[in-house]
Amino acid sequence: MKRYQKMSRLYAPTLKEDPAEAELVSHKLLLRAGMIRKTAAGLYSYLPLAWRVISKVEDVIRDEMEGIGAQEMMAPIVTPAELWEQSHRLGAYGPELMRLKDRHERDFVLGPTHEETFTDLVRDELRSYKQLPVTLYQIQDKFRDERRPRFGLMRGREFIMKDAYSFSATQESLQECYDDEKAAYARIAERCGVKALPVVADSGQIGGDTSVEFMALADAGEAELVWCDCGFAADTEAATARIAVAEGEAGELERVHTPNAGTIADLSVLLGVEESATRKALALVDGEGRPTVVFVPGDHEMNDCKAENAFGEYHMMTDEELREAGLVKGFIGPVGLPEGIRVCADEALRDSEWWLVGANLANYHYRHAQMGRDFTIPEWVDVVSAKEGDLCPKCGKPMHHARGIEVSQVFQLGTKYSESMGATFADEDGVERPFLMGCYGIGVSRMVSAIVEQHNDENGICWPVCVAPYEVEVVPLNVGDDLVWPEAQRVTDELSAADLEVLLDDRSERPGVKFADADLIGLPWQVILGKRGVKEGKAEVKCRATGERFDVPMDELVSWLSERIVPERA
Protein backbone atom coordinates (compact mmCIF):
# COMPACT_ATOMS: atom_id res chain seq x y z
CA MET A 1 0.00 0.00 0.00
CA LYS A 2 1.37 3.42 -0.98
CA ARG A 3 2.72 5.29 2.04
CA TYR A 4 2.90 8.86 0.73
CA GLN A 5 0.27 10.98 -0.98
CA LYS A 6 0.02 14.66 -1.82
CA MET A 7 -3.28 16.28 -0.90
CA SER A 8 -3.33 18.21 -4.19
CA ARG A 9 -3.40 14.91 -6.10
CA LEU A 10 -5.81 13.10 -3.77
CA TYR A 11 -9.37 12.62 -4.99
CA ALA A 12 -11.22 13.51 -1.79
CA PRO A 13 -13.83 16.20 -2.52
CA THR A 14 -14.73 17.48 0.96
CA LEU A 15 -17.94 19.31 1.85
CA LYS A 16 -18.39 22.16 4.33
CA GLU A 17 -22.00 21.36 5.24
CA ASP A 18 -23.85 18.18 6.14
CA PRO A 19 -25.73 16.77 3.13
CA ALA A 20 -29.50 17.00 3.61
CA GLU A 21 -29.95 13.30 2.78
CA ALA A 22 -27.67 12.11 5.58
CA GLU A 23 -29.14 11.18 8.97
CA LEU A 24 -26.45 9.22 10.80
CA VAL A 25 -23.18 10.79 11.92
CA SER A 26 -21.19 8.21 9.96
CA HIS A 27 -23.14 8.92 6.77
CA LYS A 28 -22.64 12.68 7.14
CA LEU A 29 -18.93 12.44 7.87
CA LEU A 30 -18.08 9.89 5.18
CA LEU A 31 -19.77 12.13 2.62
CA ARG A 32 -18.27 15.36 3.96
CA ALA A 33 -14.77 13.89 4.21
CA GLY A 34 -14.85 12.92 0.54
CA MET A 35 -14.78 9.20 1.23
CA ILE A 36 -17.99 8.03 -0.42
CA ARG A 37 -20.41 9.33 -3.02
CA LYS A 38 -23.95 8.22 -3.75
CA THR A 39 -24.65 6.79 -7.21
CA ALA A 40 -28.29 5.84 -6.59
CA ALA A 41 -30.43 4.92 -3.59
CA GLY A 42 -28.42 2.43 -1.55
CA LEU A 43 -25.51 2.42 -4.03
CA TYR A 44 -22.22 4.12 -3.16
CA SER A 45 -18.80 4.60 -4.70
CA TYR A 46 -15.89 4.18 -2.31
CA LEU A 47 -13.39 6.96 -2.99
CA PRO A 48 -9.62 6.51 -2.40
CA LEU A 49 -9.56 7.31 1.33
CA ALA A 50 -12.46 4.99 2.13
CA TRP A 51 -10.98 2.27 -0.06
CA ARG A 52 -7.77 2.37 1.96
CA VAL A 53 -9.82 1.89 5.13
CA ILE A 54 -11.72 -1.01 3.57
CA SER A 55 -8.45 -2.58 2.43
CA LYS A 56 -7.10 -2.44 5.97
CA VAL A 57 -10.25 -4.00 7.40
CA GLU A 58 -9.99 -6.76 4.80
CA ASP A 59 -6.32 -7.32 5.68
CA VAL A 60 -7.30 -7.87 9.32
CA ILE A 61 -10.00 -10.30 8.25
CA ARG A 62 -7.61 -12.26 6.03
CA ASP A 63 -5.02 -12.46 8.78
CA GLU A 64 -7.54 -13.83 11.28
CA MET A 65 -9.03 -16.27 8.77
CA GLU A 66 -5.60 -17.62 7.91
CA GLY A 67 -4.98 -18.10 11.62
CA ILE A 68 -7.94 -20.50 11.94
CA GLY A 69 -7.33 -22.33 8.68
CA ALA A 70 -10.09 -20.81 6.56
CA GLN A 71 -9.30 -20.66 2.85
CA GLU A 72 -10.09 -17.65 0.67
CA MET A 73 -11.71 -18.04 -2.74
CA MET A 74 -14.21 -16.21 -4.91
CA ALA A 75 -17.63 -17.36 -6.10
CA PRO A 76 -19.76 -15.63 -8.75
CA ILE A 77 -22.12 -12.96 -7.48
CA VAL A 78 -24.79 -14.21 -9.93
CA THR A 79 -26.32 -17.53 -8.86
CA PRO A 80 -28.65 -19.83 -10.84
CA ALA A 81 -32.15 -19.55 -9.37
CA GLU A 82 -32.49 -23.34 -9.45
CA LEU A 83 -30.00 -23.57 -6.55
CA TRP A 84 -32.29 -21.33 -4.50
CA GLU A 85 -35.22 -23.53 -5.48
CA GLN A 86 -33.34 -26.55 -4.14
CA SER A 87 -32.84 -24.83 -0.78
CA HIS A 88 -36.49 -23.66 -0.73
CA ARG A 89 -35.41 -20.04 -0.30
CA LEU A 90 -36.39 -18.68 -3.72
CA GLY A 91 -39.99 -18.05 -2.73
CA ALA A 92 -39.36 -17.46 0.95
CA TYR A 93 -36.79 -14.68 0.60
CA GLY A 94 -39.19 -12.05 -0.72
CA PRO A 95 -38.65 -8.94 -2.87
CA GLU A 96 -35.25 -8.20 -1.29
CA LEU A 97 -33.84 -10.92 -3.55
CA MET A 98 -32.88 -9.38 -6.91
CA ARG A 99 -33.96 -11.72 -9.70
CA LEU A 100 -32.89 -11.52 -13.33
CA LYS A 101 -32.91 -13.46 -16.59
CA ASP A 102 -30.12 -13.94 -19.10
CA ARG A 103 -30.58 -13.72 -22.87
CA HIS A 104 -31.71 -17.35 -22.89
CA GLU A 105 -34.50 -16.61 -20.38
CA ARG A 106 -32.74 -18.60 -17.66
CA ASP A 107 -33.43 -17.39 -14.13
CA PHE A 108 -30.67 -16.07 -11.87
CA VAL A 109 -30.40 -14.14 -8.61
CA LEU A 110 -27.91 -11.59 -7.31
CA GLY A 111 -26.56 -13.16 -4.17
CA PRO A 112 -27.38 -11.48 -0.85
CA THR A 113 -25.73 -14.54 0.74
CA HIS A 114 -24.02 -17.57 -0.80
CA GLU A 115 -25.06 -20.66 1.16
CA GLU A 116 -26.48 -22.30 -1.97
CA THR A 117 -23.45 -21.52 -4.12
CA PHE A 118 -20.94 -22.92 -1.64
CA THR A 119 -23.05 -26.00 -0.90
CA ASP A 120 -23.30 -26.70 -4.62
CA LEU A 121 -19.55 -26.15 -4.97
CA VAL A 122 -18.55 -28.87 -2.50
CA ARG A 123 -21.31 -31.45 -2.85
CA ASP A 124 -19.59 -33.29 -5.70
CA GLU A 125 -16.05 -32.76 -4.40
CA LEU A 126 -16.03 -33.49 -0.66
CA ARG A 127 -17.05 -37.14 -0.64
CA SER A 128 -15.50 -38.54 2.56
CA TYR A 129 -15.33 -37.66 6.24
CA LYS A 130 -11.54 -37.79 5.81
CA GLN A 131 -11.71 -34.54 3.82
CA LEU A 132 -13.55 -32.68 6.58
CA PRO A 133 -13.78 -30.15 8.11
CA VAL A 134 -13.32 -27.48 5.43
CA THR A 135 -13.97 -23.75 5.78
CA LEU A 136 -14.08 -21.56 2.66
CA TYR A 137 -14.61 -17.81 2.55
CA GLN A 138 -14.74 -14.87 0.20
CA ILE A 139 -14.81 -11.07 0.41
CA GLN A 140 -17.25 -9.88 -2.20
CA ASP A 141 -20.02 -7.47 -3.10
CA LYS A 142 -23.50 -8.57 -2.12
CA PHE A 143 -26.85 -7.18 -3.22
CA ARG A 144 -30.10 -6.94 -1.29
CA ASP A 145 -32.92 -4.92 -2.82
CA GLU A 146 -33.85 -3.06 0.36
CA ARG A 147 -37.30 -1.49 0.30
CA ARG A 148 -35.95 1.61 2.00
CA PRO A 149 -32.17 1.90 1.72
CA ARG A 150 -30.86 4.52 4.16
CA PHE A 151 -28.10 5.53 6.55
CA GLY A 152 -25.34 5.42 3.92
CA LEU A 153 -23.21 2.29 4.17
CA MET A 154 -25.30 1.06 7.10
CA ARG A 155 -28.24 -0.15 5.04
CA GLY A 156 -27.33 -0.05 1.39
CA ARG A 157 -28.52 -2.26 -1.42
CA GLU A 158 -25.00 -3.17 -2.53
CA PHE A 159 -22.48 -3.86 0.21
CA ILE A 160 -19.13 -5.55 0.79
CA MET A 161 -19.24 -8.69 2.89
CA LYS A 162 -16.91 -11.40 4.02
CA ASP A 163 -18.85 -14.66 4.13
CA ALA A 164 -17.45 -18.02 5.21
CA TYR A 165 -18.97 -21.50 5.10
CA SER A 166 -17.80 -24.53 7.07
CA PHE A 167 -18.54 -28.17 6.28
CA SER A 168 -18.16 -30.74 9.06
CA ALA A 169 -18.82 -34.42 9.65
CA THR A 170 -19.85 -34.19 13.32
CA GLN A 171 -21.57 -31.77 15.66
CA GLU A 172 -18.34 -31.53 17.67
CA SER A 173 -16.46 -30.47 14.55
CA LEU A 174 -19.15 -27.92 13.64
CA GLN A 175 -18.99 -26.50 17.17
CA GLU A 176 -15.22 -26.15 16.88
CA CYS A 177 -15.50 -24.32 13.53
CA TYR A 178 -18.23 -22.10 14.97
CA ASP A 179 -16.20 -21.29 18.08
CA ASP A 180 -13.10 -20.52 15.99
CA GLU A 181 -14.99 -18.10 13.77
CA LYS A 182 -16.76 -16.49 16.72
CA ALA A 183 -13.44 -15.90 18.51
CA ALA A 184 -11.87 -14.58 15.30
CA TYR A 185 -14.76 -12.14 14.83
CA ALA A 186 -14.26 -10.77 18.33
CA ARG A 187 -10.57 -10.20 17.54
CA ILE A 188 -11.38 -8.59 14.18
CA ALA A 189 -13.69 -6.05 15.82
CA GLU A 190 -11.09 -5.26 18.48
CA ARG A 191 -8.28 -4.91 15.94
CA CYS A 192 -10.44 -2.56 13.86
CA GLY A 193 -11.05 -0.35 16.88
CA VAL A 194 -14.71 -1.31 17.31
CA LYS A 195 -16.24 -2.03 20.69
CA ALA A 196 -18.61 -4.87 19.85
CA LEU A 197 -20.77 -7.01 22.07
CA PRO A 198 -21.58 -10.64 21.17
CA VAL A 199 -25.34 -11.09 21.50
CA VAL A 200 -27.73 -14.00 21.07
CA ALA A 201 -29.49 -13.45 17.74
CA ASP A 202 -32.30 -14.68 15.53
CA SER A 203 -31.21 -16.68 12.48
CA GLY A 204 -33.74 -15.06 10.15
CA GLN A 205 -33.91 -16.18 6.52
CA ILE A 206 -30.49 -17.86 6.70
CA GLY A 207 -31.78 -20.45 9.14
CA GLY A 208 -30.24 -22.71 11.75
CA ASP A 209 -30.89 -22.83 15.45
CA THR A 210 -27.80 -21.17 16.95
CA SER A 211 -26.60 -17.68 16.11
CA VAL A 212 -24.61 -14.84 17.65
CA GLU A 213 -24.29 -11.28 16.34
CA PHE A 214 -21.51 -8.86 17.14
CA MET A 215 -23.08 -5.49 17.86
CA ALA A 216 -21.07 -2.29 17.74
CA LEU A 217 -22.65 -0.16 20.46
CA ALA A 218 -23.88 3.12 18.98
CA ASP A 219 -26.76 5.43 19.82
CA ALA A 220 -27.65 5.56 16.12
CA GLY A 221 -27.70 1.79 15.70
CA GLU A 222 -30.72 0.20 14.03
CA ALA A 223 -30.68 -2.89 16.21
CA GLU A 224 -31.97 -2.98 19.79
CA LEU A 225 -30.39 -5.20 22.39
CA VAL A 226 -30.54 -5.97 26.07
CA TRP A 227 -27.54 -6.84 28.18
CA CYS A 228 -26.75 -7.74 31.75
CA ASP A 229 -23.79 -7.11 34.03
CA CYS A 230 -23.31 -10.89 34.22
CA GLY A 231 -22.24 -10.95 30.56
CA PHE A 232 -25.49 -12.06 28.93
CA ALA A 233 -26.57 -10.04 25.90
CA ALA A 234 -29.17 -10.60 23.19
CA ASP A 235 -30.80 -8.87 20.27
CA THR A 236 -34.37 -8.03 21.24
CA GLU A 237 -35.45 -10.15 18.26
CA ALA A 238 -34.02 -13.22 20.01
CA ALA A 239 -33.91 -12.33 23.70
CA THR A 240 -35.99 -14.56 25.97
CA ALA A 241 -36.21 -12.44 29.09
CA ARG A 242 -37.81 -13.26 32.40
CA ILE A 243 -40.51 -10.62 32.43
CA ALA A 244 -41.75 -9.49 35.82
CA VAL A 245 -45.50 -9.59 35.10
CA ALA A 246 -47.77 -7.82 37.58
CA GLU A 247 -50.58 -10.14 38.69
CA GLY A 248 -54.19 -9.00 38.43
CA GLU A 249 -56.51 -9.02 41.42
CA ALA A 250 -58.16 -12.28 42.54
CA GLY A 251 -61.95 -12.46 42.79
CA GLU A 252 -65.14 -13.27 40.96
CA LEU A 253 -65.25 -12.41 37.27
CA GLU A 254 -66.48 -8.82 37.02
CA ARG A 255 -67.39 -6.89 33.90
CA VAL A 256 -66.56 -3.19 34.30
CA HIS A 257 -67.55 -0.20 32.17
CA THR A 258 -64.45 1.31 30.56
CA PRO A 259 -65.72 3.97 28.14
CA ASN A 260 -63.24 4.97 25.42
CA ALA A 261 -60.47 2.92 27.06
CA GLY A 262 -59.45 1.17 23.87
CA THR A 263 -55.72 1.39 24.60
CA ILE A 264 -53.63 0.04 27.44
CA ALA A 265 -52.59 3.58 28.40
CA ASP A 266 -56.21 4.76 28.63
CA LEU A 267 -57.27 1.65 30.57
CA SER A 268 -54.39 2.04 33.02
CA VAL A 269 -55.36 5.65 33.78
CA LEU A 270 -59.09 4.91 34.02
CA LEU A 271 -58.77 2.00 36.45
CA GLY A 272 -55.68 3.26 38.28
CA VAL A 273 -53.57 0.17 37.60
CA GLU A 274 -50.05 -0.33 36.27
CA GLU A 275 -49.84 -1.17 32.57
CA SER A 276 -47.95 -4.34 33.51
CA ALA A 277 -51.09 -5.56 35.34
CA THR A 278 -53.12 -5.46 32.12
CA ARG A 279 -53.11 -7.88 29.18
CA LYS A 280 -52.80 -6.56 25.64
CA ALA A 281 -54.64 -8.40 22.85
CA LEU A 282 -53.15 -8.24 19.36
CA ALA A 283 -55.27 -9.41 16.42
CA LEU A 284 -53.55 -10.68 13.30
CA VAL A 285 -53.91 -13.05 10.37
CA ASP A 286 -51.23 -15.74 10.45
CA GLY A 287 -49.26 -17.10 7.51
CA GLU A 288 -51.94 -19.73 6.86
CA GLY A 289 -54.72 -17.15 6.74
CA ARG A 290 -56.16 -17.94 10.19
CA PRO A 291 -57.55 -15.11 12.34
CA THR A 292 -55.34 -15.08 15.43
CA VAL A 293 -55.36 -13.30 18.78
CA VAL A 294 -52.19 -13.23 20.86
CA PHE A 295 -52.06 -11.88 24.43
CA VAL A 296 -48.95 -10.15 25.77
CA PRO A 297 -48.13 -8.19 28.95
CA GLY A 298 -49.71 -4.75 28.72
CA ASP A 299 -46.41 -2.90 29.08
CA HIS A 300 -44.60 -4.85 26.34
CA GLU A 301 -44.66 -4.86 22.54
CA MET A 302 -44.74 -7.73 20.10
CA ASN A 303 -41.51 -8.20 18.17
CA ASP A 304 -42.01 -8.53 14.43
CA CYS A 305 -39.19 -11.03 13.92
CA LYS A 306 -40.39 -13.26 16.75
CA ALA A 307 -43.95 -12.99 15.47
CA GLU A 308 -42.86 -14.15 12.02
CA ASN A 309 -41.17 -17.15 13.62
CA ALA A 310 -44.39 -17.97 15.48
CA PHE A 311 -47.02 -17.10 12.87
CA GLY A 312 -45.28 -17.11 9.50
CA GLU A 313 -45.81 -14.20 7.12
CA TYR A 314 -48.56 -12.53 9.14
CA HIS A 315 -50.29 -9.17 9.01
CA MET A 316 -52.22 -7.21 11.61
CA MET A 317 -55.98 -7.32 11.09
CA THR A 318 -57.66 -4.44 9.33
CA ASP A 319 -60.87 -2.95 10.75
CA GLU A 320 -62.84 -4.93 8.17
CA GLU A 321 -61.07 -8.19 9.10
CA LEU A 322 -61.79 -7.50 12.78
CA ARG A 323 -65.50 -7.12 12.03
CA GLU A 324 -65.55 -10.28 9.91
CA ALA A 325 -63.91 -12.23 12.75
CA GLY A 326 -66.40 -10.87 15.29
CA LEU A 327 -63.72 -8.99 17.25
CA VAL A 328 -64.17 -5.60 18.92
CA LYS A 329 -61.17 -3.34 18.40
CA GLY A 330 -59.58 -2.25 21.67
CA PHE A 331 -61.70 -4.57 23.83
CA ILE A 332 -60.58 -8.10 22.86
CA GLY A 333 -60.17 -10.66 25.64
CA PRO A 334 -59.88 -14.45 26.11
CA VAL A 335 -63.30 -14.86 27.78
CA GLY A 336 -65.98 -15.59 25.20
CA LEU A 337 -63.95 -15.21 22.04
CA PRO A 338 -65.79 -16.08 18.80
CA GLU A 339 -65.33 -19.55 17.30
CA GLY A 340 -62.58 -20.10 14.74
CA ILE A 341 -60.00 -17.83 16.35
CA ARG A 342 -56.47 -19.12 16.94
CA VAL A 343 -55.72 -18.12 20.55
CA CYS A 344 -52.15 -17.69 21.82
CA ALA A 345 -50.34 -15.94 24.64
CA ASP A 346 -46.74 -15.02 25.24
CA GLU A 347 -44.71 -17.32 27.48
CA ALA A 348 -44.29 -14.44 29.94
CA LEU A 349 -47.94 -14.89 30.94
CA ARG A 350 -47.86 -18.66 31.46
CA ASP A 351 -47.65 -18.39 35.26
CA SER A 352 -50.03 -15.44 35.53
CA GLU A 353 -53.39 -16.60 36.92
CA TRP A 354 -55.46 -13.41 37.22
CA TRP A 355 -55.93 -11.17 34.18
CA LEU A 356 -57.41 -7.75 33.45
CA VAL A 357 -58.63 -8.09 29.86
CA GLY A 358 -61.09 -6.91 27.25
CA ALA A 359 -64.64 -8.28 27.50
CA ASN A 360 -65.22 -8.63 23.73
CA LEU A 361 -67.82 -5.90 24.10
CA ALA A 362 -67.29 -2.25 23.22
CA ASN A 363 -66.35 -0.10 26.23
CA TYR A 364 -66.13 -3.03 28.67
CA HIS A 365 -63.32 -5.04 30.31
CA TYR A 366 -63.17 -7.97 32.70
CA ARG A 367 -61.52 -7.79 36.10
CA HIS A 368 -60.50 -10.96 37.96
CA ALA A 369 -60.47 -13.19 34.84
CA GLN A 370 -58.91 -16.43 36.07
CA MET A 371 -56.98 -18.71 33.76
CA GLY A 372 -58.44 -22.19 33.95
CA ARG A 373 -61.75 -21.05 35.45
CA ASP A 374 -62.85 -18.41 32.96
CA PHE A 375 -60.64 -19.12 29.95
CA THR A 376 -57.83 -21.30 28.66
CA ILE A 377 -54.83 -20.56 26.47
CA PRO A 378 -54.30 -23.43 24.02
CA GLU A 379 -50.99 -22.20 22.59
CA TRP A 380 -47.96 -20.47 24.07
CA VAL A 381 -45.50 -18.47 21.95
CA ASP A 382 -42.44 -16.25 22.42
CA VAL A 383 -43.25 -12.98 20.67
CA VAL A 384 -42.52 -10.17 23.13
CA SER A 385 -39.57 -7.78 22.76
CA ALA A 386 -37.35 -7.72 25.81
CA LYS A 387 -36.81 -4.26 27.25
CA GLU A 388 -34.84 -2.47 29.92
CA GLY A 389 -35.72 -3.73 33.39
CA ASP A 390 -36.74 -7.21 32.25
CA LEU A 391 -34.88 -9.91 34.13
CA CYS A 392 -31.83 -11.66 32.75
CA PRO A 393 -32.56 -15.31 31.85
CA LYS A 394 -29.08 -16.20 33.06
CA CYS A 395 -28.81 -14.54 36.48
CA GLY A 396 -32.22 -12.96 37.14
CA LYS A 397 -30.99 -9.38 37.51
CA PRO A 398 -32.56 -6.43 35.65
CA MET A 399 -31.15 -5.93 32.16
CA HIS A 400 -30.06 -2.75 30.39
CA HIS A 401 -31.19 -1.55 26.96
CA ALA A 402 -28.85 -0.32 24.23
CA ARG A 403 -28.71 0.26 20.50
CA GLY A 404 -26.15 -1.27 18.22
CA ILE A 405 -24.92 -1.79 14.68
CA GLU A 406 -24.70 -5.39 13.58
CA VAL A 407 -21.20 -5.80 12.12
CA SER A 408 -20.99 -9.59 11.96
CA GLN A 409 -22.96 -12.75 12.66
CA VAL A 410 -22.18 -16.45 13.02
CA PHE A 411 -24.65 -19.30 12.47
CA GLN A 412 -24.82 -23.01 13.05
CA LEU A 413 -26.89 -24.12 10.07
CA GLY A 414 -26.89 -27.83 10.79
CA THR A 415 -28.23 -29.72 7.76
CA LYS A 416 -30.68 -27.03 6.52
CA TYR A 417 -28.94 -26.64 3.16
CA SER A 418 -27.08 -29.92 2.81
CA GLU A 419 -30.26 -32.00 3.21
CA SER A 420 -32.39 -29.96 0.83
CA MET A 421 -29.60 -29.79 -1.77
CA GLY A 422 -28.44 -33.40 -1.44
CA ALA A 423 -24.92 -32.50 -0.27
CA THR A 424 -23.59 -35.61 1.49
CA PHE A 425 -20.37 -37.38 2.42
CA ALA A 426 -19.54 -40.95 3.40
CA ASP A 427 -18.93 -41.41 7.14
CA GLU A 428 -16.58 -43.94 8.75
CA ASP A 429 -19.09 -46.74 8.08
CA GLY A 430 -19.64 -45.71 4.48
CA VAL A 431 -23.08 -44.28 5.22
CA GLU A 432 -24.05 -41.15 3.28
CA ARG A 433 -24.78 -38.25 5.64
CA PRO A 434 -25.53 -34.56 5.02
CA PHE A 435 -22.82 -32.05 5.90
CA LEU A 436 -23.17 -30.14 9.15
CA MET A 437 -22.72 -26.55 8.07
CA GLY A 438 -21.94 -23.20 9.60
CA CYS A 439 -21.90 -19.77 7.98
CA TYR A 440 -20.15 -16.65 9.18
CA GLY A 441 -20.55 -13.12 7.81
CA ILE A 442 -18.89 -9.76 8.38
CA GLY A 443 -20.24 -6.57 6.83
CA VAL A 444 -16.98 -4.97 5.68
CA SER A 445 -18.52 -1.71 4.47
CA ARG A 446 -20.82 -1.64 7.49
CA MET A 447 -17.77 -2.05 9.74
CA VAL A 448 -16.44 1.22 8.29
CA SER A 449 -19.65 2.99 9.32
CA ALA A 450 -19.45 1.44 12.78
CA ILE A 451 -15.87 2.67 13.21
CA VAL A 452 -16.91 6.22 12.33
CA GLU A 453 -19.96 6.05 14.63
CA GLN A 454 -17.68 5.17 17.54
CA HIS A 455 -14.75 7.45 16.60
CA ASN A 456 -15.82 11.02 15.85
CA ASP A 457 -16.26 14.44 17.41
CA GLU A 458 -17.88 17.72 16.41
CA ASN A 459 -15.11 18.42 13.89
CA GLY A 460 -15.00 15.13 12.02
CA ILE A 461 -13.72 11.58 12.05
CA CYS A 462 -11.07 10.34 14.51
CA TRP A 463 -9.68 7.24 12.79
CA PRO A 464 -7.91 4.68 14.98
CA VAL A 465 -4.38 4.02 13.72
CA CYS A 466 -5.26 0.41 12.88
CA VAL A 467 -7.64 1.34 10.05
CA ALA A 468 -6.77 4.97 9.23
CA PRO A 469 -6.35 5.68 5.51
CA TYR A 470 -3.03 7.33 6.38
CA GLU A 471 -1.38 7.61 9.77
CA VAL A 472 0.09 11.12 9.68
CA GLU A 473 -0.90 14.33 7.94
CA VAL A 474 1.87 16.86 7.41
CA VAL A 475 0.38 20.36 7.37
CA PRO A 476 2.75 23.14 6.25
CA LEU A 477 1.02 26.43 6.97
CA ASN A 478 2.58 28.22 3.98
CA VAL A 479 3.76 26.11 1.06
CA GLY A 480 5.21 29.24 -0.57
CA ASP A 481 7.62 29.86 2.28
CA ASP A 482 11.25 29.03 1.42
CA LEU A 483 11.84 27.74 4.94
CA VAL A 484 8.60 25.85 5.65
CA TRP A 485 8.03 24.03 2.35
CA PRO A 486 11.44 22.34 2.04
CA GLU A 487 11.14 21.24 5.67
CA ALA A 488 7.68 19.80 5.00
CA GLN A 489 9.07 17.79 2.09
CA ARG A 490 11.99 16.57 4.18
CA VAL A 491 9.74 15.54 7.09
CA THR A 492 7.37 13.74 4.72
CA ASP A 493 10.23 11.84 3.08
CA GLU A 494 11.70 10.81 6.45
CA LEU A 495 8.37 9.66 7.87
CA SER A 496 7.60 7.71 4.71
CA ALA A 497 11.08 6.15 4.73
CA ALA A 498 10.40 5.06 8.32
CA ASP A 499 7.43 3.04 7.04
CA LEU A 500 4.78 5.50 8.23
CA GLU A 501 1.84 6.34 5.96
CA VAL A 502 1.82 10.07 5.22
CA LEU A 503 -0.56 12.54 3.62
CA LEU A 504 1.11 15.86 2.74
CA ASP A 505 -1.20 18.87 2.46
CA ASP A 506 0.66 20.69 -0.30
CA ARG A 507 -2.28 22.93 -1.20
CA SER A 508 -1.99 26.71 -1.26
CA GLU A 509 -4.91 27.12 1.13
CA ARG A 510 -5.37 29.25 4.23
CA PRO A 511 -4.35 27.52 7.49
CA GLY A 512 -7.97 27.49 8.67
CA VAL A 513 -9.06 25.50 5.62
CA LYS A 514 -6.22 23.02 6.10
CA PHE A 515 -6.98 22.56 9.80
CA ALA A 516 -10.69 22.03 9.10
CA ASP A 517 -10.00 19.42 6.42
CA ALA A 518 -7.39 17.69 8.59
CA ASP A 519 -9.87 17.34 11.44
CA LEU A 520 -12.68 16.31 9.09
CA ILE A 521 -10.66 13.55 7.39
CA GLY A 522 -9.38 12.58 10.81
CA LEU A 523 -5.94 11.00 10.40
CA PRO A 524 -4.60 9.99 13.83
CA TRP A 525 -1.68 12.44 13.93
CA GLN A 526 -1.12 15.90 12.45
CA VAL A 527 2.35 17.43 12.06
CA ILE A 528 1.89 21.19 11.80
CA LEU A 529 4.82 23.19 10.42
CA GLY A 530 4.90 26.96 10.80
CA LYS A 531 7.73 29.42 10.20
CA ARG A 532 8.46 30.04 13.88
CA GLY A 533 8.53 26.34 14.76
CA VAL A 534 10.77 25.47 11.84
CA LYS A 535 13.20 28.23 12.85
CA GLU A 536 13.27 26.79 16.38
CA GLY A 537 13.72 23.24 15.06
CA LYS A 538 10.33 22.06 16.36
CA ALA A 539 7.12 20.66 14.93
CA GLU A 540 3.71 20.97 16.53
CA VAL A 541 2.15 17.50 16.67
CA LYS A 542 -1.57 17.09 17.32
CA CYS A 543 -3.30 13.89 18.40
CA ARG A 544 -6.60 13.89 16.53
CA ALA A 545 -8.44 11.67 19.03
CA THR A 546 -7.64 13.69 22.15
CA GLY A 547 -6.77 17.11 20.75
CA GLU A 548 -3.50 17.12 22.70
CA ARG A 549 -0.64 19.10 21.17
CA PHE A 550 3.06 18.45 21.58
CA ASP A 551 6.17 20.41 20.61
CA VAL A 552 8.55 17.79 19.23
CA PRO A 553 12.14 18.49 18.14
CA MET A 554 12.58 17.86 14.42
CA ASP A 555 15.41 15.40 14.95
CA GLU A 556 13.17 13.29 17.23
CA LEU A 557 9.98 13.51 15.17
CA VAL A 558 10.28 10.21 13.31
CA SER A 559 11.07 8.15 16.39
CA TRP A 560 8.48 10.02 18.49
CA LEU A 561 5.67 9.25 16.04
CA SER A 562 6.84 5.71 15.32
CA GLU A 563 6.74 4.86 19.03
CA ARG A 564 3.08 5.92 19.14
CA ILE A 565 1.88 4.60 15.79
CA VAL A 566 3.53 1.22 15.20
CA PRO A 567 2.18 -0.47 18.39
CA GLU A 568 -1.35 0.67 17.47
CA ARG A 569 -1.39 -0.96 14.06
CA ALA A 570 -3.82 -3.85 13.63
Question: What is the role of each PLM region?
Answer:
Residues 1-570:
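NTP/phosphate- and nucleic-acid-binding module
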